[in-house]
Curated annotation (Swiss-Prot):
This is Auxin-responsive protein IAA1. The lineage of its organism: Eukaryota, Viridiplantae, Streptophyta, Embryophyta, Tracheophyta. It comes from the Eukaryota. Belongs to the Aux/IAA family. Residues 47-69 have a biased composition (Low complexity). Gene3D superfamilies: Phosphatidylinositol 3-kinase Catalytic Subunit, Chain A, domain 1. Keywords: Auxin signaling pathway, Nucleus, Repressor, Transcription, Transcription regulation. It is found in: Nucleus.
């Protein structure tokens, strides 16, 4: 039976045009010649200086020099790789985390989406609608007040230096550039945070 399998394997290899040497696993690159990949063990290596001189003589023609030159760098196509619009918008946005004293969760707010402090306060009221309402006081000041127990909350922010400041102390653009995160503190805890103008 083994004779029959050998015949069938040789017949199939003859039919496909491949013999054992073509399909054998070796350490040479596919398609390279077997004689070039397997040097004769009795043959001595040539010295590198003599082979360099022979290569230099062969490369004297301009066609050979052009073939050995590295390929020119490819020009980068404008707009490639494609960047999705939501990634572009995400890079342009300035998200900061908002923490509320007594709330076990944080929210994120995009400061670039608002044009002033009033819009930011309304957005904070919307984010934490179960907690706060905005009340106007006699001196035309708006404050966030807890709807359940009447506790006042003061919006504060951490700047790039790590200092906690009151929201509204600086112009809006400067606030957007320097704000790292927001915190709505109870007004009783925010006593030490005085406006810069008062200091």
């Amino acid at each position: 039976m083994s004779v029959e399998t050998e015949r069938s394997s040789t017949e199939s290899s003859a039919a496909s045009g491949l013999d054992f040497e073509d399909t054998a696993l070796t350490l040479r690159l596919p398609g390279s010649l077997a004689a070039a990949a397997a040097p004769d063990p009795d043959r001595k290596r040539s010295s590198p200086s003599s082979s360099d001189a022979a290569d230099a003589a062969d490369n004297s023609s301009p066609l050979a020099a052009a073939a050995d030159a590295p390929p020119a760098p490819k020009a980068r196509v404008v707009g490639w790789p494609p960047v999705r619009s939501f990634r572009k918008n995400a890079l342009a946005a300035k998200f900061v985390k908002v923490a509320v004293d007594g709330a076990p969760y944080l929210r994120k707010v995009d400061l670039e989406a608002y044009s002033g402090y009033d819009q930011l306060l309304r957005a904070l009221q919307d984010k934490f609608f179960s907690h706060f309402t905005i009340r106007k006081f006699a001196d035309d000041e708006r404050k966030l007040v807890d709807a359940v127990n009447g506790t006042e909350y003061v919006p504060t922010y951490e700047d790039k230096d790590g200092d906690w400041m009151l929201v509204g102390d600086v112009p809006w653009k400067m606030f957007v550039e320097t704000c790292q995160r927001l915190r709505l503190m109870k007004s009783s805890e925010a006593v030490n945070l005085a406006p810069r103008a008062a200091q």
